Every structure is written in C-alpha cells, then in structure tokens.
C-alpha cells in the first residue's frame, strides 16, 4: 500500500489544493449536485448522458437516482442504456430487477451483458448464467456486437482512461494485451497509473491518504481528478464535503458528475450520522429511566 501511496503523492506534488468554497451561485450543495446530474442525464449529447448516468452508481439505495437510471434504460442510445444497466447493480436497486430482466432482450449485446452483470450483483445469478450459456452455445445472436463495442471503446481515449479509474492498478488494459492498443491511442503514460493509485487507496483510512487524495482531486489531469473523487466517495467520510465542493463546477463533465454524486453520497452519510448522534442522548435517558 505504501508503494501505491508514493505513486500518488509523487505525481501530486506541486499541485495546489483548491480552496474549499461553496458553489458560485450559493445554492445548497445537494441542490447544485442534483442539478448537475439532471442536466447531464437529459443532455442532448449522448456522451454526456453516459457520463452522468455512470456517476449514479455512487448513490446506493437512493430512490431519485434509481429513477434516473431506470429512465435511462429506455434511452435511444445504446451506450446510455448500457451505462444505466451497469449502474443499477452497484446502486443496490433490487426493485429495478424487472426492468433489468427486460433489458436482457435489448438488441444491443453491450446492454444485455450490462444488465446481466447487475442482476448477478443484485443476487439473481441465474439470469447472468443464462446469457453466458446462450452465448457459449451460439444461441445468443449478435454476440459479436459486444466485441465490436469493446473495440470501439479502445478508440475512445476518455473511455480508456475511465477503465483505469474503475478497475485499479491491476486493471486491463494496463495489465493485459490491450495495453499496446492503448499506447497507440494515448500519449499520456502517467495519468492512468496515478488514477489507478488514487482508486486503490479508497479503502485505506490513513490521514496521509486523505491529504494525498485531496491534492490529487485538484490535479491538472481530469482522469486523476475523477479517480480521486471516486476514491473520496468510497471512503464515505463527510469531512471531504468541503474539500470537493469546487469540483461541482469542474470544466470536465466526468469529474463534475462524479463529484455531484459524491456530494450527495457524503451528504446522506452526514445526515445519517447526525441523526444517530441525536438519538444517543434519548436512548441513554430511556436506559437510565428504566433502571
């Protein structure tokens, strides 16, 4: 873990930490965050819709986010539908199972596999196994389309960078055959490694990691900023709310959407902590009265 920390810290040196300031229009944080995501999922550009829907995965058991993802399952663009199907699993959207099962009949293989994966995550492995079986014996038509869609992603530098953000240090393409393809596409050799390092540190609660992530989130490379925000979300520490507030206005839409989902996630956690703290005196008084 110390090696991963040194990678992140070394490349983050000299990067100034952005000031912890509220959004420019003084909107409440959560209102600003929801507005960003709403604008993203309804954007006329499919790429932005994909990025906004993808960010929803950071909001588990959130009815509003779940409704947004479910609506995206019916998007006219297959990449948006696939992003929605992938997001619903990590969101713990058990009530979305019927909609995910319906998505198994989508004409685009990428959507089908995304839905099958989420069903597996949600505790319905039989659906995923059925899809895999049909592909194996050749009954599932259009399976080649999934391969084609993956090859198309190799031509998309942002998609490749996000693959690094999502899967960590041991991720494909940087640990497998696709690495050579990536090198032909991108001239940036360090950002993916730094992004992976940031994500890998998500579960390490050392205070030094907090400082490194706070610094990395203001990095000049968007992939590093996005990875740092993702790691901050996974740490579930409301103390980071003030730190990542400026990212709600990040010029990169991926960072902006990830930060918006992170603000909502941490705000919900903060509210839960405050409610729990408020209940403690009452519980103690009741216990004392019962003695």
Could you describe each region identified by the protein language model?
Residues 145-160, 174-189:
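Acidic, Ser/Thr- and Gly/Pro-rich intrinsically disordered linkers and low-complexity segments
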Residues 52, 84, 115-116, 147, ...:
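Conserved hydrophobic register position within alpha-solenoid helical repeats
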């Amino acid at each position: 873990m110390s090696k991963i920390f040194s990678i992140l810290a070394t490349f983050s040196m000299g990067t100034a930490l952005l000031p912890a300031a509220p959004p420019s229009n003084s909107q409440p944080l959560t209102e600003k965050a929801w507005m960003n995501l709403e604008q993203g999922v309804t954007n006329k550009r499919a790429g932005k819709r994909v990025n906004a829907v993808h960010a929803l995965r950071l909001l588990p058991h959130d009815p509003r986010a779940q409704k947004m993802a479910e609506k995206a399952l019916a998007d006219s663009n297959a990449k948006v539908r696939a992003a929605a199907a992938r997001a619903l699993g990590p969101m713990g959207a058990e009530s979305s199972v019927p909609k995910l099962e319906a998505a198994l009949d989508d004409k685009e293989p990428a959507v089908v596999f995304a839905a099958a994966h989420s069903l597996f995550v949600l505790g319905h492995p039989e659906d995923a196994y059925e899809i895999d079986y049909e592909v194996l014996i050749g009954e599932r038509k259009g399976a080649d389309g999934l391969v084609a869609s993956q090859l198309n992603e190799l031509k998309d530098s942002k998609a490749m960078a996000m693959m690094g953000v999502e899967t960590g240090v041991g991720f494909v393409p940087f640990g497998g055959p696709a690495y050579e393809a990536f090198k032909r596409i991108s001239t940036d050799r360090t950002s993916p490694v730094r992004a992976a390092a940031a994500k890998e540190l998500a579960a390490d609660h050392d205070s030094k990691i907090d400082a490194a992530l706070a610094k990395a989130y203001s990095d000049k490379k968007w992939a590093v900023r996005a990875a740092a925000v993702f790691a901050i979300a996974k740490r579930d520490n409301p103390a980071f709310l003030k730190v990542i507030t400026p990212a709600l206005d990040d010029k990169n839409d991926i960072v902006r959407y990830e930060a918006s989902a992170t603000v909502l996630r941490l705000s919900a956690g903060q509210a839960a902590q405050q409610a729990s703290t408020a209940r403690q005196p009452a519980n103690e008084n009741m216990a004392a009265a019962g003695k």
